[in-house]
Amino acid sequence: MAILVSGGAGYIGSHTCVELLNAGYDIVLADNYYNSCPTALERVKEITGKDFRFYQADMTRRGDVEKIFQDCPDIDAVIQFAAYKAVGESCKKPIEYYSNNLNCTLNILDVMREFDCHNFVFSSSATVYGDPECVPITEDSPVGRTTNPYGTTKAFTERILNDCCEADSKLNVALLRYFNPIGAHESGLIGEDPNGIPNNLVPYIAKVAVGKLEKVHVFGNDYPTPDGTGVRDYIHVVDLAKGHVCAIRKLTQNPGLVVYNLGTGHGYSVLDVIHAFEKACGKELPYVIDPRRPGDIAECWADPGKAKAELGWQAQYGIEDMCAHSWNWQSKNPDGYSK
């Protein structure tokens, strides 16, 4: 059995490849390096001491996907990470987001059907819940009231996968709704390395801490939260990666379609994260309050009980470890993978 990991050189993908290899799986990795770079793959090999097949391929091109399956007839499951992923950018470029994110998955599903592959893990997001009526959020919370095109692409893809499972009783799908992944592998060899100025909070804080950016921008301090800043469920990327290994194991039981929240069940504000990072790096970090960003919500955290009960999965790291590992990565790699 081999697992195709599309978008496997990216932040979550690379950490998941480490966990899959360490768990004894054979992987086929595909990436077009749009949001990633080859160095990450060399670091994955360094961490695990294992090799894997790699294709520089674009999942929006069906021919690229078909070639991978033709070359690798042992592929028995797919973990689909390949997507554009910036909430703010999606509000400015909705057409690009809908085209890319939907077509990546549609092409993979079409080729899977052709090659008789029936196991699919989808990298979904808590953004499918939109602005929740209440927290913590369970898997039964309303879906589809999204507040940005990125989240809508995830909600649309979930609907597509639901329809595919209705039409094909052999298809097994795990929808993994991530909350807010941060942190890095404890080795400091792989981590989050965004192109240009980071869109997400923790890599931005890390760039400020390492002296690459001047100050942290806090978008809004007038939310109905304890300190006025947005509250999120931050999850260590290694915990998240291990959740994918558990999902692959679940699919071997032929469950049809299953849905899991992957979060810690704890909410932390933007200021909580800044202060935790200050503790990790041993310095005070300057920040300014800016207006809210379009598409942002006040608070969001998970009820991860279903994943614990059905997958045997539970997050192990707290916010202090997440920030410490992010700082370890950033301080060892101040310019990301480029140096």
Residues covered by each model-derived region:
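N-terminal Rossmann-like NAD(P)+-binding domain of SDR-like oxidoreductases, especially those catalyzing
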Residues: 1-184
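Alpha-helix initiation/capping motif
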Residues: 58, 68, 130, 142-150, ...
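Short, solvent-exposed loop/helix junctions and linker helices
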Residues: 6, 99-102, 150-151, 195, ...
